[in-house]
UniProtKB/Swiss-Prot annotation:
SUPFAM superfamilies: 6-phosphogluconate dehydrogenase C-terminal domain-like, NAD(P)-binding Rossmann-fold domains
Family: Belongs to the mannitol dehydrogenase family.
Known catalytic reactions: D-mannitol 1-phosphate + NAD(+) = beta-D-fructose 6-phosphate + NADH + H(+)
Gene3D superfamilies for the chain: N-(1-d-carboxylethyl)-l-norvaline Dehydrogenase, domain 2, NAD(P)-binding Rossmann-like Domain
Protein name: Mannitol-1-phosphate 5-dehydrogenase
InterPro entries the UniProt entry points to: 6-PGluconate_DH-like_C_sf, 6PGD_dom2, Mannitol_1_phos_5_DH, Mannitol_DH, Mannitol_DH_C, Mannitol_DH_CS, Mannitol_DH_N, NAD(P)-bd_dom_sf
Top-level taxon of the source organism: Bacteria
One of the record's GO cellular component terms: cytosol
UniProt cross-references to PROSITE patterns, sorted A to Z: MANNITOL_DHGENASE
Keywords (A to Z) from UniProt: NAD, Oxidoreductase
This enzyme's EC code(s): 1.1.1.17
Length: 379
């Protein structure tokens, strides 16, 4: 089986690309980093350093790479592969959608009606459905109808912490990852036979898993980063080692967890164990996870479907406590990082228009009581 994977960054190489290659799939990476592309094509392999209680290096083979700016190369791949995955970041999906539309149209014209499945592996809710909508903006109604027949747009939830690591001179493509990984896909959205990929779990209730991960791992990770930054530490593992930080992170995940328990009938004890597992992952002594990396892009993280506002809206829906989630929103608004364009934009907007206007603009919150709480805590 042949797959095209967009994004040869740490997640692409250390998570999705690895799972595909481990299952005997030939993976062609598409990326804009020509140095990395050349390294993949020359070395035809790279190491994945898995760090934890039993650290080891596993080698990924059966790979090639193309430059995603080379439209012809991308189109040729899309015309023939059976699976396409992405790990490019939510913001990039919209940029590559016109090229995907052109490539899928070319596949149609070439007469290839074999099933093709596309899975966006991004930190967002129903990322593939979003990607599909962006692709379809560039296609005619008749093209859309034809593509619907043989292309599956499969939503997924992905979870693996893959922080940047020191360059290994002997293997510049080597990537460091934690032991834990979770890739859950919506089995109802595939076209044709579902590919047999070790480590890819199937479900018909994806939103429960998407929100479990978003409301727990992502929410907790972000709170750890903000509190760690306030405490003056560099790494997430240092932040979570501070008792008051760990307590606040856990309390926030418990607030968002109460929404999940109510919404999806999760077992409270099982969810409490899931929270403990995540706290242990944050404390992994082998992972150098920078608080600025985790805290970056506050505008995206304050959006209505993301890790702070979505669980907060859930607490309002069910009449549940949300003190810690509100604190999280305040910390996101207070996040300052001169090297992060979103942080700069947010700070400037607050300076020009005030906190209440920023809350309304970026979060979509309409509950006046909560907006007032945020403003009071910010000032």
């Amino acid at each position: 089986m042949n797959a095209l994977h967009f994004g040869a960054g740490n997640i692409g190489r250390g998570f999705i690309g690895k799972l595909l290659a481990d299952s005997g799939v030939f993976v062609t990476f598409a990326d804009i980093n020509q140095t990395q592309i050349d390294q993949i094509n020359q070395n035809k392999q790279y190491g994945v350093k898995i760090v934890g209680d039993a650290s080891r290096v596993e080698v990924v083979k059966n790979i090639a790479a193309i430059n995603s700016k080379d439209e012809e190369a991308v189109i040729e791949q899309v015309k023939s592969v059976e699976l396409i995955t992405t790990a490019v970041g939510p913001n990039v999906l919209g940029f590559i959608a016109p090229l995907f539309a052109k490539a899928l149209a070319a596949r149609l014209e070439a007469g290839n009606t074999q099933p093709l499945n596309i899975i966006a592996c991004e930190n967002m809710v129903r990322g593939t459905s979003f990607f599909k909508a962006k692709i379809f903006e560039n296609l005619t109604a008749s093209q859309q109808a034809e593509i619907e027949k043989f292309v599956g747009f499969v939503d997924s939830a992905v979870d693996r912490i893959v922080p940047p690591a020191e360059l290994n001179e002997a293997d510049p493509l080597e990537v460091t990852v934690e032991e834990f990984s979770e890739w859950i896909v919506d089995k109802t959205q595939f076209k044709g036979q579902i590919p047999d990929i070790k480590g890819m779990e199937l479900t018909d209730n994806l939103m429960a898993f998407v929100e479990r991960k978003l409301f727990t791992l992502n929410t907790g990770h972000l709170i750890s980063a903000y509190l760690g930054k306030q405490a003056g530490v560099k790494w997430i593992k240092e932040a979570i080692a501070i008792d008051s930080v760990k307590a606040a992170v856990k309390a926030t995940m418990e607030e968002s967890g109460a929404v999940l328990i109510k919404r999806y009938n999760f077992d409270p004890q099982a969810h409490a164990a899931y929270i403990e597992k995540i706290l242990k992952r944050f404390a992994n002594p082998y992972l150098n996870d920078d608080v600025n990396r985790v805290g970056r892009e506050p505008i995206r993280k304050l959006s209505p479907n993301d890790r702070l506002i979505k669980p907060l809206l859930g607490t309002l829906e069910y009449g549940l406590p949300h003190k810690n989630l509100v604190n999280g929103v305040v910390m996101a608004l207070q996040y300052r990082n001169e090297e992060d364009p979103q942080a700069v934009e947010l700070a400037q907007f607050i300076a020009d228009n005030g906190v209440a206007a920023a809350v309304e603009k970026y979060t979509g919150l309409t509950n006046q009581e909560v907006i007032d709480q945020v403003v009071a805590l910010y000032n």
